[in-house]
Amino acid sequence: MKNYKLFNVGDKVTIVRSHSNDIGQIGTIILVRPSYCKIQLPNGEIKNHTYGQFASLAQ
């Protein structure tokens, strides 16, 4: 199954790998694309992350 079909706008995710200092933060997906998602962090910052860099929170 394609990665982008596993995530929806509004899903809460946690950052597990990153090149910046946002590892461990919980964010909300605001845009889903085939190769990446835009994730809004709690401080209001919006970052692009590829699918291996974040994981869905257990609902």
Give the positions of each predicted feature.
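Basic/aromatic-rich interaction segments and small domains that mediate binding to polyanionic partners
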Residues: 2-59
